[in-house]
């Protein structure tokens, strides 16, 4: 069992249950999944870009990424239906908590000019979305092997009913929010 998973089970869930006034422990909000998405639009011209993006994503997540293909053809972008244009990974259970631990304790502190996570990035249903502009902030990525600096989107899906509950949950996991 991962460190954060154990911490959630033994401490965080009990504190949240009392704070939110929930009678049943199954009602307490928890993190359901983390989805990481990397757009590789310039992979149309060069297959090596797609390969390096997939490699970096698998190093970061510890799981093989799924290639995302274009749904429609767009002539102005020289894009045809079915062309690979990105990759994504959905993390659950053990790997999710391990990734969350690395994200909060190692990656976020390494971001340049970081002033805290925006609290406006909640979607109204208790899910949090954030973007990372450089993949080199992750410790798994070797700076020497990086061909191009790429960003990624991270979506944290929770079972929380409101944004306030989700913010309390993520704050318990030591997410550095602004203010």
From Swiss-Prot:
This is Large ribosomal subunit protein uL5. The keyword RNA-binding applies. One of its GO terms (biological process) is translation. GO terms for molecular function: rRNA binding; structural constituent of ribosome; tRNA binding. This is one of the proteins that bind and probably mediate the attachment of the 5S RNA into the large ribosomal subunit, where it forms part of the central protuberance. In the 70S ribosome it contacts protein S13 of the 30S subunit (bridge B1b), connecting the 2 subunits; this bridge is implicated in subunit movement. Contacts the P site tRNA; the 5S rRNA and some of its associated proteins might help stabilize positioning of ribosome-bound tRNAs. Belongs to the universal ribosomal protein uL5 family. Part of the 50S ribosomal subunit; part of the 5S rRNA/L5/L18/L25 subcomplex. Contacts the 5S rRNA and the P site tRNA. Forms a bridge to the 30S subunit in the 70S ribosome. One of its GO terms (cellular component) is ribonucleoprotein complex. PANTHER family: 60S RIBOSOMAL PROTEIN L11-RELATED (PTHR11994). HAMAP family: Ribosomal_uL5_B. Pfam families: Ribosomal_L5, Ribosomal_L5_C. It comes from the Bacteria. Keywords: Ribonucleoprotein, Ribosomal protein, RNA-binding, rRNA-binding, tRNA-binding.
């Amino acid at each position: 069992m991962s460190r954060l998973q154990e911490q959630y089970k033994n401490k965080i869930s009990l504190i949240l249950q009392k704070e939110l006034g929930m009678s049943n422990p199954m009602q307490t909000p928890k993190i359901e999944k983390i989805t990481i998405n990397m757009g590789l639009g310039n992979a149309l011209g060069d297959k090596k870009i797609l390969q390096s993006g997939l490699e970096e994503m698998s190093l970061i997540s510890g799981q093989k990424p799924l290639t995302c293909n274009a749904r429609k053809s767009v002539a102005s972008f020289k894009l045809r239906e079915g062309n690979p244009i990105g990759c994504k990974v959905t993390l659950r259970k053990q790997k999710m908590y391990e990734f969350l631990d690395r994200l909060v304790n190692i990656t976020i502190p390494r971001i340049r000019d970081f002033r805290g996570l925006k609290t406006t990035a909640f979607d109204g249903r208790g899910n949090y979305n954030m973007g990372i502009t450089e993949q080199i902030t992750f410790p798994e990525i070797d700076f020497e092997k990086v061909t191009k600096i790429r960003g990624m989107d991270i979506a944290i899906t929770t079972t929380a009913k409101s944004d306030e509950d989700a913010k309390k949950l993520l704050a318990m996991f030591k997410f550095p929010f602004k203010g």
